């Protein structure tokens, strides 16, 4: 287990080593946030770039396409052919989906997609949440992530990782009290002073460390007193495995975001546009010079005022205007720079709701957009598949290590109802072997639905597989049961309608009226209403009524169709026992 001093030294080394990469990330962040300064003295100091920010457009569009569909965990049965193994596998899948839903994984994937494409890295740490008794995913900013170097670039599990964030002095004092003020070097402190926090994660422990203020010679003795770093929290890692997962974008040798190459072009385009605006402004408000005549001293006797019709009067000289016109190649240069940005960052015009001038048909537009976007989306989704696989294994290890024998409850998300099941982690997680896969990596939600429909039409895919792949269907098994129930209900309704139009059929007006009232007024289901109507008819037909009673009349129904109750027969001879009893009396 590393000491506080070793962790701080490790942080300083990694911060220096990651300096160039983090500087590039900060430039991407500044451009994405619009914090771009065009270095021209003629511009107002508060002026912003007045050109389209293609980086934001491309980053948002690509990230939304990557995260428009969610992957699905697949847990194969441990023993093939065993119904118990199949049931356990289904329960493991539902439990993992419930954990994802508890962590709002859909929203986290949207943020992680932006990190992966913009920063070339997506970092997440999993920790036990003792309030909800579930593993908790926390998405971390790649700018605040310092992972241990790995030999394999595809290895997403560093041996240890340091995450940083800033905390205010008021929060530290409120949370940790005298432990902070008595031991840490606080410097010139006020309630808004902020201190760097180090969150160290490895296979043995989770540690939280706060760094003291810089040892500035300008501080007095009391302000310089205290430790450089102080350990605040220590939690043993019972899982025995690293809890941080750092996914990197696939590049040649060093981290590089998808839009790193467009930044220089953007600055050039913004500067050229700014120069054009300056030239146009000077053309509207030209610079004027009072040129003296030979041997005369020029003087302006009266300033011109065009609004009031006042003429200007000049003595001893002439006023000349210096006209500046933008170059005729300026617009061509701006268009060329924009085109180069789109080519470099794979940002087609369709992202902005436009289309290239060489696109004549919708089919051609789809082909161009697919060639530009699909394979990049596929690669990003494949990266997330591998990352989520490792994250799920960590989540399973957390469940077994911290709540192995605790009976837990998970809820199966559904749009109409919520299913509830109980499980014990040590029993259900008999293995962590599984797959995480997108239904069709490289496809966004729109093209995925079209592809599923085409495969169903050609018979290449079963309806069950299509339901599992459709992102709009949260529970394929429940959807299958609903489809069967709707089909049977439709067949039952058709049967009732066909029998009702036949006057000699079993459904007579009174029975149909009773059936309709059960469905409309008492909110009974169709199958329950039919069952109750049938039982009512059976009871009526089994009860004999006296001759001439209203119940024996057919009413609106045809006679003999079962609408009337049977008539009681004539009384027969009394039984022998009754006669003997009378004689005995």
Residue ranges and their predicted role:
Residues 2-6, 13, 291-585:
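C-terminal anchoring/interaction modules
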Residues 16, 20, 51-59, 64, ...:
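Long, contiguous amphipathic alpha-helices that act as assembly "spine/axial" helices in icosahedral shell
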Residues 1-21, 36, 40-55, 78-89, ...:
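Intrinsic-disorder-associated interaction segments
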Residues 1-183, 335, 528-530, 534, ...:
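Extended, helix-rich architectural segments
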Residues 35, 67-73, 138, 145, ...:
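Generic N-terminal simple sequence motifs
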Residues 2-3, 9-16, 117-121, 127-327, ...:
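Structured, contiguous alpha/beta core segments that scaffold functional sites
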Residues 33, 45, 174, 186, ...:
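Generic detector of low-complexity/intrinsically disordered segments
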Residues 41, 73-79, 144, 151, ...:
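Intrinsically disordered, low-complexity segments enriched in proline/serine/threonine
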